[in-house]
A protein has these predicted regions:
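Glycan-recognition and catalytic cores of secretory/periplasmic carbohydrate-active enzymes
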Residues: 1-393
Length: 393
């Protein structure tokens, strides 16, 4: 395992984070460029996304916490100050969805998912440095979500609202999503930052929110027949249940496990551990003989998206290492190592740094999608490296 940890440290330092420092830092307008395309061309005037910047903040904060390299603290602080100065809505609370390349508000809607990632980033910076300002911002954003996005009547969190926290017609995270007022993805990326915030701010109100989120996963989001997580719902939690997303399933399996472990309630942990093993088994339907995991299965028409997306492989590796660590099942270690071998061979860009977005069904590299951008950040892959460095397995 020491060899695997050494490899992860090398990839993190010399393939991922150095790319973001050397290639993506925006020296002219501050923060980081909004886009580097699939051919490694920088687009200096691209809009800058909240999710990307919050994830950069998280990645460098976590890397500094674990590896203590001053250049990671410098990059984390750069991201912290940029998000604080340009994305935080000083008037209405929350954060903007995007700003232009000069840092002026562009899309001012309040996407709960993005606010969740800001909490993830600021709480990790506070965890890594003890910085009170970052912690205060994370707590304030938590209160914004609870005040405006939590639906006490139906339970759960509203997908998106206007800048002033009013209803909004188009709630979608991206063009690929259904326009549902409740999504699994947003709930996953609220429980994840709430768990991280709980590490540095253990309060009864936050614990109550986390326990409720675990109940939402087990009672509403989990498909009791297939053990996949269903993705899109309306206010009353009615959904089509027609998509199986293998990457989200395996990501949820280890994130929910992490939440139960951090909470420290043995009864909750026992319940969650029973469920997450079933979710992981369902996710394994996406595994392919080459060691990779495909993206999605649309049950209407029995169609598969066979792209091997970078983030799905990362979550597949962490999820199976988590299962091996806690349940000592050798086949899970084998799944993780085979997937890593696939990633090292196909997705890592050995020449230019960072990872390609995906390998297409025909085995070619997807260069249409970004190397760095609105949805491509040093989050999934740096987290995979850090999880494998930090864990005892």
């Amino acid at each position: 395992m020491e060899n695997l940890k050494k490899t992860m440290k090398d990839v993190l330092e010399n393939n991922i984070l150095n790319y973001w420092i050397d290639k993506v830092k925006d020296e002219e307008n501050g923060g980081f460029y909004g886009r580097v395309d699939g051919n490694d061309q920088v687009h200096p005037e691209a809009e800058k996304g909240a999710v990307m910047n919050a994830r950069i903040l998280w990645a460098f904060s976590a890397a500094y916490r674990v590896l203590k390299k001053p250049e990671y603290l410098e990059a984390a602080t750069r991201a912290k100050e940029y998000v604080r100065d340009h994305f935080l809505d000083k008037e209405y609370g929350g954060i903007y969805w995007s700003v232009d390349y000069k840092g002026n508000p562009l899309d001012t809607k309040k996407q709960t998912y993005a606010i969740g990632f800001a909490i993830y980033g600021f709480s990790e910076y506070a965890r890594a440095t003890g910085d009170q300002e970052a912690l205060d911002i994370a707590i304030s954003l938590y209160h914004d979500i609870e005040k405006y996005a939590f639906d006490a009547k139906n339970n759960g969190y509203i997908e998106a609202l206007t800048r002033e926290w009013q209803p909004i017609a188009d709630m979608r995270l991206s063009d690929k999503d259904e326009n549902g007022s409740r999504t699994m993805n947003t709930h996953l990326h609220i429980i994840e930052p709430y768990t991280n915030l709980y590490r540095v701010w253990k309060t009864e109100e936050l614990e109550k929110s986390i326990r409720n989120l675990l109940d939402i996963f087990t009672d509403k989001l989990l498909n009791q027949e297939t053990y996949h997580l269903d993705l899109f719902f309306n206010d009353e939690w009615e959904g089509k249940r027609n998509i199986e997303s293998y990457g989200h399933d395996i990501e949820a399996s280890w994130l929910l496990h992490e939440t139960a472990l951090v909470l420290g309630d043995k009864e909750v942990l026992h319940k969650i551990e029973r469920i997450i093993r079933r979710i992981a088994d369902a996710a394994d339907e996406g595994l392919r003989p080459d060691g990779s995991m495909v993206y999605e299965h649309w049950k209407d028409g029995d169609q598969f998206d066979l792209q091997r997306q970078w983030w799905v492989q990362c979550e597949n590796i962490i999820g199976h290492i988590d299962l091996y660590q806690y349940f000592r099942t050798d086949e899970n270690l084998e799944v993780a190592i085979r997937c890593w071998n696939y990633v090292a061979k196909h997705l890592l860009d050995q020449q230019n740094g960072e990872w390609h977005w995906a390998i297409l069904e025909d085995g070619t590299v997807n260069k249409e999608d970004d190397k760095a951008g609105f949805w491509k950040c040093p989050y999934h892959n740096s987290r995979m490296c850090l999880e494998l460095i930090e864990r005892e397995y």
